[in-house]
Amino acid sequence: MPGLNLTREEATERASIISSVTRYEISLDLTRGDTDFGSFTRIEFDAREGASTFADLVSNNVHSITLNGNALDPFSVHQDNRIALENLAEHNVLEVEASCQYMHTGEGLHRFVDPADGQAYTYSQFEVPDARRVYTTFEQPDLKSTFTLTVKAPKGWKVFSNAPTPTPEEEGEAWVYRFATTEVMSTYITAIVAGPYEGTTATLTSSDGRTIDLGVYARASIVEHLDADEIIEITRQGFEFFEGAYGIAYPFTKYDQIFVPEYNAGAMEDAGCVTFRDAYVFRTRPTEAQMEARANTILHELAHMWFGDLVTMKWWNDLWLNESFAEFMSHLALAEATKYTEGWTGFMVRKDWGLKQDQLPTTHPITAEIRDLADVEVNFDGITYAKGASVLRQLVSYVGRDAFFAGLHEYLTKHSYANATLDDLLSELAAASGRDLASWSKVWLEEAGVTLLRPVITTAEDGTIERLEITQEAFSEGASLRPHRMGVAGYSLTEEGTLAQVFREELDIDGASTVIEAAAGITRPDFILVNDGDLGYAKVRLDEQSLAFAINNITKFTDSLTRGVVMASAWDMTRDGEMPARDYLNLALRAVPVEDNMSLLTLTLRHIDEAVRTFVAPKYRAEAAEDTGRRLLLLARTAASGSDAQRMLVAAAARNATSLEQFEAIRALYDGTQTLDGLDLDVDLKWGLLIALVRGGAATEEDIAALEATDDTMTGHQNAAAARAAREGEWIKADVWDKVLTDTSIPNDTRWAMISGFWAQARTTPSAYAGYVGEYFEALAGIWETFTFHTAEDLTTLLFPNALAGYVPEVDVVASGKAWIEAHADASAGTIRIIRELIDVCERQIANQAVDAG
């Protein structure tokens, strides 16, 4: 039974039968209550006469189905989310009327009631296969069509879709919106957003002289925090940059950006109607890192309007190309067209995600085999985004920037409003550059894993370099040695105590060894850095002298990107057991006071948290945790008044507080009996402090209720749920565990908040959670039977007891995980993959704890 799945073979067969989908006409009725909505679909399509195929619809109540004027029995032909279509004509008309169901998981048509004012909001999220939860479809990207949408909504609601929003017609107590027909597009990038959204409008002139209407919207209760001017400015800069880079005008008629609640992703590139999670509407003062991340997301989705929406992959095996391209282009635009000129440092931070994913036992080639929709879901990861984008950056260097964009222009022009493949793109790039990309594609795109680069320095008696070579080895099994375009540089301290670059060479590194000619004969620098400028995608090692220098002189590296590469190399060595966790903590805590790039500071603080939580040896953990909390609190107190760093360090100190003295200091900040000059103790920061206090037994239910009463919002209630789950007590943890596993009415964001609170004491009293190892594996099969894929995936990951690995002698998380896999060979590929990855995380933790123990 297919269930919700679709195989590539089925999609290929259906596309061979359906020669074209002429048009969709869709009517939705959103006035029928809070559980169901009306859905009528009329599809005109051409097919091979006499053949049979199927359409897709997820609905528990199909009222009528008509094919070419003949009524079909819904009970007979609508089975397993498919509508059987037999004995097709050359020209066909399918009409389906159904009641579809609102979702609360961010899939299909999501419905949300704002606790701040009781207003209801809806929005769609269709990637990968969820348009079929809203209307009848041929749910695959290569069966493109036009869409004409009519929506009946409660009076006062605004409705947005891919075409411009028309003036509504009154119909009793409802408004009816009749949208114009869209451009040709795939079903997964169609959109419906409806509710009492409020916002700001503007216009811009496209490169072909058209006026493009812009809109930025959010819920009424948070619209006061919507800094639309900043968002519109980034959007204008992105339009100008992308139209210039692609040589093609914006391909749709308008551009709305709508910030929506309880989103299960960051954003979605629906054509001309982009949705974002409304955590990007900052209700308190954002850090520079948060502003840059939002700008990058805005540009990422805008880049998709050409690459992904105008030209779309034929099948999901090229999803990586879609996302990697947008990831690369957004950072390029960020650095070259906006005020966020250090955008490539943020790119380096994102690369951390890809490198981690690439070292898991489930790593896959960038061009992974996607046999069905289940494969899409499990391969939508750091390789799809971060590694792919890094490899595209290498490709730009390999073929040359001018040739890259010339080839890209030809690709987008030839396949406009149609579908294409990776081979189509590579052929255009090869033609534009004159380079044969077959061998490059094989080692970079068709093989999994990562290689490791290491400097080997031979020094003469007089201190000069006789030979500097970069060796390359296949760190991952099966990975070939790859060509890399990157910089290698040397740095030394000056007499004034500053750090100066004494040589740099940008070159192609290929094969097992590459000699750096620029270094020959010069005095050995204090520090040698492979991948200076972060052009490459590889694991990079520091030689022994350079590592020692970095530990003692990290504050001397004034360029954020250089500093970031140094810190990334040190962290990678820590993860691989070549640098004890406590040594990394010493380096990182020395780097924090001088870190002026907030994206890099965010990453460093995240790595500090991870090192203390998982890599420090059990016998040293209490001491290391207390020392880390103390030093972070001191750094917070000495940070620049009112700075982003001050705010981030206060939050980090609270997360890492362990001693009575530290909790007393956090409590004094929370109560206002002690203050830090310039620190704005806003409601978001107060929640972070309060959750930490609850974790340490320094705050109560009364404190939670008092703060929640002042923050009667979605975010406030989610934070309160996290705080309540963070309370100590066996019955409290048992209640949280039961609710997140059984109560399907809980919104996912609230569920994730509760789980974060559940594990609050895992670092200080891990043995208290020992019983949940068995309970987790007993519940695992039921999770995948009860919840949708996205929810099941997150539950499986967030409830996994990796926090106990190595720290609770009476349980063996690794052995339990392996035993579960052995006993459940018939489990879904997605489930098995996640458990294998989490077992690997635990094995790495235990190995690194042994290294740290000495």
Spans of model-derived segments:
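N-terminal, polar/Ser/Thr-rich
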Residues: 1-38, 115-121, 141, 438-442
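Beta-strand-rich binding/interaction modules
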Residues: 61-68, 437-438, 450-531
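Surface-exposed beta-strand/loop patches in extracellular or lumenal glycoproteins
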Residues: 42-59, 139, 148-154, 423, ...
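Glycine/proline-rich low-complexity spacer/linker segments in large multi-domain proteins
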Residues: 8-16, 97-148, 195-200, 534-560, ...
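Hydrophobic alpha-helical and helix-loop surface patches within well-folded domains
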Residues: 70, 179, 215-479, 603, ...
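Long, ordered, helix-rich scaffold segments
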Residues: 351, 382, 465, 478-480, ...
